[in-house]
Amino acid sequence: MARYTGPSCRLCRREGSELFLKGERCYTDKCAIKRRSYPPGQHGQGRIKVSDYGVQLREKQKVRRIYGILENQFRGYFETADRMKGVTGENLLFILERRLDNVAYRLGFATSRDEARQLVRHGHFTLNGKKVNIPSLQVKAGDVLQLREKSRKVAAISESLEGVVRRGIPQWLELEKDAFKGTVKAMPVREDITMPIQEQLIVELYSK
């Protein structure tokens, strides 16, 4: 399955929810879903009855798009979550939250997960003192993510860090802004994930 390269705002309208795919734009009145809250397309404003399967599918697609994950990898994450102790749906969200690119985004080094993924791939960070370029790497408690010295003058990163107060940092992470460093204080819990996600619908979809 190819990665989506079309307009990001169209995806938010399709899912009927803010996915925060466009960085700072998503926090302004320019956000597409704030201006047009109905789905895109000729029949977007029409009322369409959606089946239970359709509701489950849309929820899965929404979460995939929030984190920028392709279907095969997302299915793999679900299978891993299903083998773990605890609640499968919550385990899935924890796996997604612990991705290195998501942690870089959550700490404020980037205004979107896609931007954070690019920063990781281009080698802008170290993890526990070692250069890292794998966006899907899973962090653990005690890990330290730091921006490399030569990357600290990148304007986009500095501007993103300035806006981190508005976006907020989850309690399981800690940012030392002046040191361009973030620490994983603990593993995320369900309360840390404030996006409107109904993970049980995804469990029901994959359990069919």
Curated annotation (Swiss-Prot):
Keywords: Ribonucleoprotein, Ribosomal protein, RNA-binding, rRNA-binding. InterPro entries: Ribosomal_uS4, Ribosomal_uS4_bac-type, Ribosomal_uS4_N, S4_RNA-bd, S4_RNA-bd_sf. Part of the 30S ribosomal subunit. Contacts protein S5. The interaction surface between S4 and S5 is involved in control of translational fidelity. Pfam families: Ribosomal_S4, S4. Belongs to the universal ribosomal protein uS4 family. Residues 98-159 form the S4 RNA-binding domain. The keyword Electron transport does not apply. One of the primary rRNA binding proteins, it binds directly to 16S rRNA where it nucleates assembly of the body of the 30S subunit. With S5 and S12 plays an important role in translational accuracy. GO terms for molecular function: rRNA binding; structural constituent of ribosome. CDD domains: S4. GO terms for biological process: ribosomal small subunit biogenesis; translation. This is Small ribosomal subunit protein uS4. The keyword Ribonucleoprotein applies.
